[in-house]
Amino acid sequence: EIADIHLQIWPGTDVALNNALAYVLLNDGLVDEANVERHASGLSDLKEFLIEYTPAKVAKITGCTEDQIIKTAHTIAEAKAMLTFWFQGYNHSTQAVFKNNTLHNLSLLTDNFCRVGAGPLSLTGEANALGNRWVGALSHLLPGVRQVANYQHRTEVADYWGVPVVQIQPVPG
């Protein structure tokens, strides 16, 4: 009732919708492609991949109208910032990786990374899974989701902690 846009898609069609939004963003000239290429690789591959995700085709897959898809893409492009939230259920599907990739693609295409009020935000639960990763409470991680097996990551943490890097073991444990 309070949403400006509500896309009531059919179950399992998130990836198609997100790809159609990306298709519109790119094909309607709503993306600063030079900016995307400064921060990521593979834009030409993405464009080629998205050819199959026209609003007309995806409308039939998702249950949305073609106009809803186009309007949503333009709204995203024109917004000062876009912040996407998803919860653990989004990650518990056979398409979880693709769902996350497509959300991240939308943030990248609209320059909504590393800006105040913008970006993708996973709100995981389950005994504070996200918090455990960020503070290094898992055996293979250091704070900031740095890997113990990565020498550069160990060096960064050792420098911050003021200890010799050899004090941080390179194997989980």
What are the language-model segments listed below?
Residues 1-128, 134, 155-173:
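Cofactor-pocket helix-loop regions in the catalytic cores of large enzyme subunits
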Residues 6, 128, 135-151:
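Surface-exposed loop and adjacent secondary-structure segments within mature catalytic domains
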